[in-house]
Amino acid sequence: MNIADGRQAFSAPAKLNLDLRITGRREDGYHNIESIFCLIDLQDTVYLKPRDDGKIILHNPVDGMPQEVDLSYRAASLLQKYARNPAGVEIWLDKKIPTGAGLGGGSSDAATVLLVLNRWWQCGLTQRQLIDSGAALGADVPFFIFGKNAFARGIGDRLDEMDIPKQWYVIVKPPVHVSTAKIFTHESLTRNSASSIMPTFQNLQPFRNDMQAVVFKEYPEVWKAYSELSRYGFALMTGSGACVFTACQDRNSAYNIYRQVSDLYEAYLAEGLSKHPLLSV
């Protein structure tokens, strides 16, 4: 969508980890995972405006952080060396995805910047090259570049498309920020879940999140939100938290739960997507 001042609007959807297992720790300190990633229609909007002077300007960094450490800025900076001509861009972020929630908001914004600027700047990078570049920005970035629901392995950069039934999700965000680094370095974290061959959505059930027990121990507010949501059905934490969610087969069922929990918590009602909106552009 074009805006009067020359900006163009692009979607950056959130994700849920419907299953997350840690299968080992690598020599470089990162962890190998296996996870089901699902796109949802809760999304940020990234506004981009091209410049021809080589400058990258992020107009509204998240939480007042310096623009140089923002993932969207870093994504644009990363691509500049591949641009055919001196290229710049102005970036605005309309945030709807809560930060520090396990929903991948910052990573999704960065992936959208990479996908759009790869075209605008005629960088010519393949999807695989974008995925490899995006992995340097964050573990969730490759999935958003892949753009389809997926079973992920490695550090999240080995992706196979997965067929996930259409579902609605109720997402609850407790009033706490979870430190991903703290959870990944916790002595009690499970790091040896059995690795599987490429599964189907059905044969991975019951779903689990290997980080959930540690987060519940260190952040009681997440446990409380999980306990509340579990009253209505099977609940699970996404990513390293803090959000927890439950799935429903139809919107009415999900909305009824949403009405109840939104009186107690910041809550979201979201529909699952089969592919990234930019794949249709």
UniProtKB/Swiss-Prot annotation:
ATP binds at residues 98-108. InterPro entries: GHMP_kinase_C_dom (IPR013750), GHMP_kinase_C_sf (IPR036554), GHMP_kinase_N_dom (IPR006204), IspE (IPR004424), Ribosomal_Su5_D2-typ_SF (IPR020568), Ribsml_uS5_D2-typ_fold_subgr (IPR014721). GO terms for molecular function: 4-(cytidine 5'-diphospho)-2-C-methyl-D-erythritol kinase activity; ATP binding. Pathway: Isoprenoid biosynthesis; isopentenyl diphosphate biosynthesis via DXP pathway; isopentenyl diphosphate from 1-deoxy-D-xylulose 5-phosphate: step 3/6. Keywords: ATP-binding, Isoprene biosynthesis, Kinase, Nucleotide-binding, Transferase. Its EC number is 2.7.1.148. It catalyses: 4-CDP-2-C-methyl-D-erythritol + ATP = 4-CDP-2-C-methyl-D-erythritol 2-phosphate + ADP + H(+). It is an enzyme of class 2 (transferase). It comes from the Bacteria. Disulfide bonds: none annotated. The active site is at 15, 140. GO terms for biological process: isopentenyl diphosphate biosynthetic process, methylerythritol 4-phosphate pathway; terpenoid biosynthetic process. PANTHER family: 4-DIPHOSPHOCYTIDYL-2-C-METHYL-D-ERYTHRITOL KINASE, CHLOROPLASTIC. Catalyzes the phosphorylation of the position 2 hydroxy group of 4-diphosphocytidyl-2C-methyl-D-erythritol. Belongs to the GHMP kinase family. IspE subfamily. This is 4-diphosphocytidyl-2-C-methyl-D-erythritol kinase. It comes from Neisseria meningitidis serogroup B (strain ATCC BAA-335 / MC58).
